[in-house]
Amino acid sequence: MEYNRISFVEALQNLAQRAGVELPEREQTAEERQQADARVTLRDMNKEAAVYFHYLLKSKRGTQALSYLKNRGLSDETINHFGLGYADIYRDDLYQYLRSKGFTDYQMKESSLVNIDTVKGNYDKFFNRVIFPIMDMNQRVIGFGGRVMGDGEPKYLNSRETILFDKGRNLYGLNYAKRSRSNAIILCEGYMDVISLHQAGFTNTVAPLGTAFTPNQAMLLKRYTNEVILSFDSDGAGIKAALRALPILRQNGLRAVSYTHLRAHET
C-alpha cells in the first residue's frame, strides 16, 4: 500500500480486480471516506494539470518549450507518449485554470501545484519550465517534474510529497518499463535519460525522482526483475550515485552491474 500510496480499501479492491473476485460491500468510516475523497480530488487535479500543461506545449505559448524538446531529439510520438508539457511564464496561470475547474485554494495547496500566500499572492510551483508528468503503476498522474530551458536554478524542480506521491517509493518510467519483455531493468539518472532511451527502444529504463536511490526503490524493482543495469554518467556525481546504488540493489536480492557513459549533451 505504501509503495502505491493507496488506502487499504483501494489495495484490496485492486487485488480483487486482478484475481477476478467480487468483494462484499463494507461501510466506510468517516475517516476512510475523507481520505478516499482527498485522493480522488488530487488525482483529478493532477490529471487536469497534466492535460493543461500538454495543451500549452502544443499551443503558440509553448513554441519555445516544444523547440527545446525537439532539439533534444524527441519525436512528437515520444512527447505525446510521455505526456510532456509546458508551464507558462505567468506565475498564476495554472492557479487560474484550476480555479476555473472548481478546485479550492486548500485543495490546490495540498496538491503541491500551487503556493497559497495571502501576502505575496498565490503562485504556481512550476512556471516557464518543461513539464514531466510522473505516473503510478495504473497510469495515473501522481506528481510532476519541471526543467528550466536556460541556465536558471534549480535546473530541475519536483513536486513535494503528497498523499499520492512519495519520491523515495516511486521510479520515473516504471509504469512503462514493467511491460518490457527484457529480463533486466536499466536504472539511469533523470527524466530525459529515460525518455531518450525509451525512444531508442530501451523501454525497460527507469530513474529515481530527484533523490538518491533508496532501499524502497530497490524493493519496488524487485517486484519486476532480478537484474538491474546502472547507466549513469561517467562524471564524479554519476560515479558516486552508482557506488551508492549498487550495494542497495544487491542487499535487496538484485543482480546489479554498472555501466557509465559519456553523454552527448547535458540533461
Q: What name fits each language-model region?
A:
Residues 2, 55-57, 85, 164, ...:
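Residue-level marker of alpha-helix boundaries and capping positions
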Residues 205, 256-258:
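Generic structural signal for residues in well-ordered beta-strands
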Residues 1-110, 129:
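Non-catalytic accessory segments of DNA primases and related replication-initiation nucleases
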Residues 260-267:
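Conserved small/polar residues in nucleotide/adenosyl-binding loops
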Residues 220, 248-254:
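Arginine/glycine-rich "motif VI" loop of SF2 helicases in the C-terminal RecA-like domain
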Residues 232-234:
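Short glycine-centered, acidic/aromatic-flanked micro-motifs in structured strand/loop junctions
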Residues 34-49, 67, 89-224, 228, ...:
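Phosphate-handling DNA/RNA-contact segment within nucleic-acid enzymes
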